[in-house]
């Protein structure tokens, strides 16, 4: 599925016809999941789970992978996250679906569709699984838990989660396939700078990362021409 096709498809979820078919299911499924939350231990646990779909966590995990030596994966992941969040936020404000305010979310909060946390979680799972298939079950299980947590905590309707998953998976597939088509060049870029051995090297590391990220992005754009 091409990105343009996905962007055209997602708003259809909120068309009048789709609303007639999905409205009851969406409301009932969301309230059922929310009703499972009794405010106890699981509520606290799912707050931690939902954090793993946040932009903050994704930045931290990307940095950790880069420092651990998985530079190629970290650079591709960074591109995936940037595009995923740009598309997710664009769709949020284009569709402007209200949050489920009856579940305790203030009406002035950021629009609901699609779920950005879910998009990030599935983008992460799809990207890492494409490079390390043995972790696929674990990665997608975690992504599903993040998605579930968003309705469990009352932040999203179920269709927001479906939309977020589609955004994350689709963009990840597009970017990772493009990166693998120029894998040699991406690998070379990722290895242009040796790991820092001094404080000066550590200080320069963010600039090195940004430079490499821009070079990888250019390599993918050049490949598309």
Model-derived regions: residue spans:
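N-terminal transmembrane-helix/juxtamembrane module of multi-pass inner/ER membrane proteins
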Residues: 1-57, 89-107, 192-194, 211-225
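Membrane-helix interface segments
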Residues: 41, 70-74, 132-138
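Alpha-helical transmembrane spans of integral membrane proteins, capturing the lipid-embedded, hydrophobic core
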Residues: 3, 77, 81-89, 165, ...
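Helix-loop junctions at the membrane-solvent interface of multi-pass transporters
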Residues: 67-69, 94-95, 178-182
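Aromatic-anchored segments of alpha-helical transmembrane domains
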Residues: 9-14, 84-89, 143-155
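Membrane-embedded catalytic cores of phosphoryl/pyrophosphoryl-handling enzymes
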Residues: 101-222
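Interfacial segments of alpha-helical transmembrane regions
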Residues: 62-86
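Hydrophobic, aromatic-rich transmembrane alpha-helices
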Residues: 58-69, 123-126, 137
């Amino acid at each position: 599925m091409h990105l343009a096709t996905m962007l055209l498809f997602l708003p259809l979820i909120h068309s009048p016809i789709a609303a007639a078919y999905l409205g009851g299911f969406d409301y009932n499924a969301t309230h059922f999941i929310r009703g499972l939350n009794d405010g106890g231990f699981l509520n606290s646990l799912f707050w931690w789970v939902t954090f793993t779909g946040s932009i903050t966590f994704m930045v931290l995990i990307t940095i950790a992978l880069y420092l651990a030596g998985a530079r190629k994966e970290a650079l591709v992941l960074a591109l995936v996250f940037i595009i995923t969040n740009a598309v997710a936020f664009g769709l949020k404000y284009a569709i402007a679906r209200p949050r489920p305010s009856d579940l305790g979310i203030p009406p002035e909060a950021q629009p609901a569709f699609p779920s950005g946390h879910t998009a990030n979680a599935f983008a992460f799972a799809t990207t890492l699984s494409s490079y390390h298939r043995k972790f696929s079950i674990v990665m997608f299980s975690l992504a599903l838990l993040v998605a579930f947590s968003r309705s469990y905590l009352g932040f999203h309707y179920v269709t927001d989660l479906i939309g977020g998953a589609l955004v994350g998976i689709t963009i990840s597939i597009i970017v990772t396939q493009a990166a693998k088509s120029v894998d040699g060049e991406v690998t070379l870029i990722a290895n242009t700078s040796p790991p820092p051995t001094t404080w000066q090297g550590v200080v320069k590391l963010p600039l090195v990362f940004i430079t490499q990220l821009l070079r990888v992005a250019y390599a993918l754009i050049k490949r598309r021409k």
